[in-house]
Amino acid sequence: MSRFLVLDSGPLGLLTHPQRNADVVAITEWLSRCLLSGHRVIIPAIIYYELKRELLRAGKSFSVARLEAFASRTPGRYLPLSDEALQLAAELWAKARQQGRPTADAKDLDVDVILAAQALSFESAPSDVVIATSNAKHLSQFVTAQNWSEILP
C-alpha cells in the first residue's frame, strides 16, 4: 500500500546534510526504497521553515541549496500551510493543554502541533498518512507518527 510520508525536521535535515555519514547514507537509501515502492514524500511548509531558518542562521548555504532543490524536485512535494491547517492546529493545541498533555511551552509556536495539523488536513485519508520523524512522542498523540527508520518501504 502506498502512503504519504510527511517528513519532520530530523529526517529532512539528514536528507539535506552534505556529508555522507552513516545516518545520511541510511536515510538516503530508505528514501530511495520508499519512492520505488510508490510512497509520496511530502515536505510541510512548517518543517521547511523550521529547518531553513536554522540552516540560514548557521550559514550552511550548501544545505540550504540542497533543501530548496529537494523540496522543488517533485511537483506536489511541498505542502503549503493552509488556513484550515492553522485552525486545526489551534484546536489541537488547546485540546492538548486542556487535557494536561502540552507538547511545548505555552509561549512557543509549537511546530509539532502545526505539523500534525498539516498532516491531518492533507488530501488523503488519515490512514494513508504517516509522519516520518526522529521522535514520535509528541506527534503521536495527534496523528500517526513513526521513527523514519521503522517505516517499511
Short names for language-model regions:
Residues 75-101:
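Acidic catalytic patch
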